[in-house]
A protein has these predicted regions:
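Active-site neighborhoods and metal-handling regions in enzymes and metal-associated proteins
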Residues: 1-400
């Protein structure tokens, strides 16, 4: 077996262990990212993993490319003949007179496709397997961590180049263009994938002054105002001014894997209260880092951060402002930006070695902007390791 094949086998084995625990007979993978994770190919189709026996990737397009890429056996997909083909290739699951329990990640499955699957497989009982896939993908392998380290290195190099362009009068979008071009030349895909329905995200945000405090639909503390209501997030044409906070939040996708980082910059000098708030963001980061270790409930870093924000007298500004505050401190990240674990109240599951996640303590001040920091980490056997390479500091640039 090749290294890729061994990786796919290990992932499939973990999926099957979770299926056995839930008495699932077969798992239908439909989301492009899930299909890639388990097959090694992101061609359009449905990968079916039986609890026993050979998995098969039924491909709509392109069968030719899937045959070259997929670790699973590939077959052309036709929903008209799907039931017959499933019975032929997986008789232990799809035998006549049996009511198999089938799972799919409902959070990433269109109603239209689900209805067609129900029509094609009328005898099946369906169950939501969203949590199953999230659990399996939450713990990263050595190969995945290698891709994440490459991503972090590319982001750091691009950020350093982008920093050289920041000066009074330059537009947010021009800074973002420098950073994005530098990342693209180094292997960034140009996209970051999100699992959340109806969500999309640009490569990054450069948000200066009040742009950093502009609320929007995106489930994050700072999104930028963007160009237009049709894209209400990201950098804008607004010119950077002296003595205002500039938040640079960038994601970089290398070999499919995303890292996320944020730094706060000022040309000149920040107001004293904003400098103090930034100091609290770093303090929250340091305290939360201590809690990134195996066995700690996902919610604990969030609850500790909220307590510190309260002590600072800044709770109304923490992770957004007022009704637009988000209710998390960090998020899992990998092939998608919004993976497990979620550092938020109510998530009592324990952290495990190999989980990759962000911490992003940020404070938002309406009409003035946002300050804060974000890094990507991996949970280790004894604590955590910061994958982000960029130095943790408030970046102060001279007026020129």
């Amino acid at each position: 077996l090749t290294a890729v094949d061994r990786e796919i086998v290990a992932r499939t084995d973990r999926l099957r262990a979770a299926m056995r625990a839930r008495r699932i007979d077969a798992f239908f993978l439909t989301r492009n990212v899930d299909v890639y994770y388990f097959t090694g190919s992101m061609q359009n189709g449905i990968a079916v993993v039986p609890v026993e026996g050979e998995p098969v990737f039924w491909v709509r397009r392109s069968v030719t490319r899937a045959e070259k890429e997929s670790a699973f056996r590939t077959k052309p997909l036709s929903l008209r003949t799907f039931e017959r083909e499933l019975a032929e290739h997986m008789p232990e699951v799809f035998v006549s007179g049996r009511r198999p329990v089938l799972a799919a990640a409902f959070e990433a499955l269109s109603a239209q496709l689900f209805m067609r699957l129900q029509e094609a497989l009328p005898s099946a009982e369906w169950t939501d397997g969203s949590a199953v896939v999230r659990e399996v993908r939450a713990v990263k392998s050595a190969a995945e961590l290698a891709a994440l380290r490459q991503s972090a290195a590319v982001a750091d190099e691009a950020f350093r180049e982008g920093l050289k362009s920041i000066r009074e009068g330059i537009a947010e979008i021009d800074v973002m263009a420098v950073i994005e071009a530098q990342m693209r030349r180094r292997g960034h895909f140009g996209v970051m994938r999100m699992r959340a329905y109806n969500h999309e995200i640009p490569t990054g945000v450069v948000a200066a002054g009040e742009s950093g405090a502009e609320p929007t639909y995106f489930d994050g503390p700072v999104a930028g105002c963007g160009f237009h209501p049709a894209m209400p997030q990201g950098a804008s044409f607004r010119a950077i001014r002296r003595n205002e906070p500039i938040m640079v939040d960038i994601g970089c996708t290398v070999e499919g894997y995303v890292t996320d980082q944020t730094r706060t910059i000022v040309v000149g000098e920040l107001d004293a209260d904003l400098r103090e708030a930034y100091g609290w963001a770093e303090r929250i980061m340091r305290e939360a880092e201590k809690l990134l270790r195996p066995g700690v409930p996902w919610e604990e870093p969030y609850l500790a951060a909220m307590a510190l924000a309260e002590r600072a007298g800044l709770s109304d500004h923490f992770m957004g402002f007022g009704a637009d505050r988000v209710k998390f401190l960090g998020h899992g990240i990998g092939l998608e930006v919004d993976e497990w674990p979620v550092l938020a109240k109510g998530f009592a599951q324990p952290l495990e070695p190999g989980m990759v996640l962000t911490l992003e303590p940020k404070f938002v001040f309406p009409g003035r902007g946002a300050v804060g920091i974000e890094n990507t980490y991996v949970v280790t056997k004894n604590g955590c390791e910061k994958l982000t390479l960029t130095e943790d500091r408030l970046v102060v640039l001279p007026i020129r």
